[in-house]
Amino acid sequence: MNNDTNITTGGKERVAQAADLYQHAFRDDPVISYMLCGLDTQQRHDYLYEYFTRLNTAAALNAAIFEEADNWASASVILPPGKRIDNPWTLVPAGFFQVLWKLGFAGCNRMLREYEPAVTAMQRQELGDTTHFYYLFAIATREAARGRGLSSALIRKLQQRAADEDASVWLEATTVSSARLYAKLGFKSVGVVTLGEGVAAPDGSKEQGGTGVPVDCMVWRPGKEDHSE
């Protein structure tokens, strides 16, 4: 880990700050564009702060770890072992059903009946029935701060935490560039889930006959992949 990177850790008090960063960093994320298919580009951009506020709140209610680097130039949201963001007991207080309402029928179907089951199946195929793994729910860096290794520093800190507990780390890479970064940090691709085959382009936009949106499921295991500089 880069010892020059200042990283701080917190919890639910950081929901809004993380949402503010993510609304910009994920403006054109392919999976989010695909999920929010009922909104045009401007509507989607305008909605992202609320979207991430709801999701971050659901994560926080499940003991998520919020870490930031260099005064919120980069941030991650991490679910500890045994915790899930789709816990039904916390979705209601998080206001998640407002997200489902905004998604509309098609968006709900894509999130709940397409994305979640496919990723969960891949997860179980690779990790079995164990819940002893960290889930890197979200990580992003502000555009002006990219190229400084901030996301890498956050991930290395997570890897050290996981290694101390002999736990794996799971994530889903939604872009080629992010998958490349994770691979450099020792994550192994265990399979690609393709969303919207025949109806979506790789960037998440609508396209009849499109090849769909690829999501690279990846895992890191302590002692098997290097997380050093």
Q: Where does each model-flagged region fall?
A:
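Conserved active-site alpha-helix within GNAT-family acetyltransferase domains
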Residues: 152, 164-166, 175-199
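A short helix-loop-beta-strand connector motif used in the catalytic cores of GNAT acetyltransferases and
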Residues: 46-67, 74, 131-132
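A short beta-loop-alpha structural element at the N-terminal edge
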Residues: 5-24
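Helix-loop element at the rim of GNAT/NAT acetyltransferase active sites that forms part
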Residues: 20-42, 55
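Conserved acyl-donor/pantetheine-binding loop and adjacent beta-alpha core of acyl/acetyltransferases
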Residues: 75-142, 196-211, 224-228
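Eukaryotic N-terminal low-complexity, Ser/Thr- and Lys/Arg-rich leader segments
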Residues: 1-6, 12, 223-229
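Conserved acetyl-CoA-binding loop-helix of GNAT-fold acetyltransferases
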Residues: 141, 147-160
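Conserved GNAT acetyl-CoA-binding A-motif
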Residues: 132-134, 161-174
